Amino acid sequence: RYNVDESIPHLNSSWRQKICLWSFSVVDHFDLSRDVVAVSMSLFDRFLATRGNRCNGSTARLASLAVLHIAIKVNEVQRIKLGTLANFSRGQFGPRDIEEMEWNVLTSLDWKIHPPTSMSFVSHLLLLLPPQIDDACKEEIYSLSRYITELSFCESAFVETNPSSVAFAAILISLED
């Protein structure tokens, strides 16, 4: 399991991967859709971009809590209390800290918090497969494409890649297998 309070000495691909894996562990713990992580990481990346991609480890950890909470509220019926989420910081942040960071994120992004995700593109693109392909095969393509897109969330090299391009590439790779 990954904890949000792990050391993030400087913002690079390893900190992003830790935040992404931690986010997956939280959504898995609460049995939420893994698509929440795609939205959360998009919010995180766009928030950092408004700050010139400059952020210390503490701010990155707090922002990761805030964007995950926003993504859960926007995409899930189930709610996670701020106090519960704050517990994942092992006392480093309280509910009020997360709430203030949420406001900071929302205003920085002009409330544009529902980005298209690579998984939504995968779902739509798979509808274009020929009807001759059986459902079991389509499900296999979907599962592998989903896995590939989830890997892309954790990789900083894909931050500036359009979600539709990631989805298309994931499907092409899935079709090769």
PLM features: what roles do these ranges have?
Residues 1-65, 69-124, 132, 140-151, ...:
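Acidic, Ser/Thr/Pro-rich regulatory low-complexity segments at or just upstream of the first helical elements
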Residues 55, 133-137, 154-162:
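Short acidic, glycine/proline-enriched loop segments that cap or flank alpha-helices
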Residues 143-177:
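Extended serine/threonine-enriched, polar tracts that run as long, contiguous segments within proteins
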